[in-house]
Amino acid sequence: MALLLLGAPLRAQDVPDEAHEARVNAIEMAHAFTDESFIVRDGFWRTRLAPNEEVVCALQLFAGVDYWICLGSGTPEAQLQMGLFTSAPRPVAVLERVQEPSRAAIKVRPRTSGLFYLKVRNNHGQAARVCVTYCYK
């Protein structure tokens, strides 16, 4: 029975696409922090980045709360970079940073509540689908 399943041909809907892989990588990165009592936010943002393109998305964050902002890509060779900025725009201090193939995360603790801007850049020579989510405590 197992041999029949392993030898079964894949249908188009069985093959995960790049957008799905980006979301899976972002969610897996966020879930890595649940052991530290972080709660994964039920929501995400995703887009496609051209080579050397950067995009900005807005996040509502609150003072004194710890956040892990997690980024995933469906492109294994992706070279992603991210930073968080206030509306001033001033960079928010990054407490910790994790960088892995296809995913990354930054830990921040904003001093004030408000709208913050996450800048994501694709430093790779190929387009990449990316997905962002975050967890907090």
Could you tell me what each predicted segment is?
Residues 8-12:
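Sec/Tat signal peptide C-region and signal peptidase I cleavage site
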Residues 13-17, 43-129, 135-137:
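Acidic, Ser/Thr/Pro-rich low-complexity intrinsically disordered segments
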Residues 13-38:
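Predominantly extracellular/luminal regions of secreted and cell-surface proteins
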Residues 5, 39-40:
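Short Pro/Gly-enriched beta-strand edge/turn motifs at strand-loop
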